[in-house]
Amino acid sequence: MQIEPAADAFGQTYAAGQAQVVWTTLVADLETPVSAFLKLATRRPLSFLLESVEGGATRGRYSIIGLDPDVVWRANGPNAEINRTARQPDAFAPCGAPPLAALRAFIAESRIDIPDGLPPMAAGIFGYLGYDTVRLIEEIGPPNPDPIGLPDAILVRPTIVVIFDAVKNTITVVTPVRPDQAVSAKSALARAAERLGTVVDDLDRALDKEQATDAGGPLVVEPRSNTTPAEFQRMVLAAKDYIAAGDIFQVVLSQRFEAPFGLPAFALYRAIRRINPAPFLFYLDYEKFSVVGSSPEILVRARGDTVTIRPIAGTRPRGATPHEDKALEAELLADPKECAEHLMLLDLGRNDVGRVARIGTVTVTDQFFVERYSHVMHIVSNVEGKLDPRHDALDALAAG
């Protein structure tokens, strides 16, 4: 196994007190992200898999597996906690700051330079921020009932990141190294090589037959809503009253569906990625629960100094034939209601980017084009702006 960087270069960076990554690259023509995850994540809680399918048909370039976090951060309501001994699941301590300030500090301490040639997600923090984290940003009244009782947010800092590159057909196994005065550079590099070697050995083993068994046919379940049709209709009428009164101009009425499920959570992920592949597929394992999903859209992206929001609104089903598909696209783009809804979201997107972008840099780079996915097509636009130096990625997230 060949690792990078070389020992001399590693030692210089380590002596300078800078965090860095150590990595090895493998050929990936006999492995898939799912098979690798099944090999690597067994008996490794707090792991995750992120994949991408673009346009409903083409696999995105990168798939990412994260393992063995050294730090776990979580927030619930006005409180944030951090666990710096992640192998002890209950070793959380209060952050001593409000959640957004604590998160900004966690992001700052986790920053690490990624060498040219490695994907930008080769190290960092990963996880979810739930809908209720909006209460950290906006005053929207008292909290709703919380029958599920999950944290509003959880972010982990993996010590192993495995990146599939579908263009180069490679697997890059990365481990971050942070300087420790009690550990020499030679020992730190040896420990990093050992972590990488363990992952390479696990990838080399045969997949357990029980693990490799396909997730099966369609999962036939009867979902149950937490809202009756009559209750939902009353919500619609109340929303219309708020709009007429000028209190709101946009509202998303939602309901929760639940169903019994006796299979491993990863079986659900495998079914979703087959039935509804999308640009953002995610599986996050938090031991006591998992977060599984497939989404066509980003909330907001901050990459370098560019902030991006992609409004998606306006929907039609996919056609059974190419001719029907084209006809449905034309119908969608000619629908006044769908176009008005999309224009409203496009205006909101420009406004949101403008909250954190330098004056004069907000542009609509694409507008009113149609993206196709496995089951539906959407009207999509793209808004970009240059991040104002007074703001950071967390500000961009709050603006979005």
What are these regions (language model features)?
Residues 1-400:
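Extended alpha-helical targeting/anchoring segments
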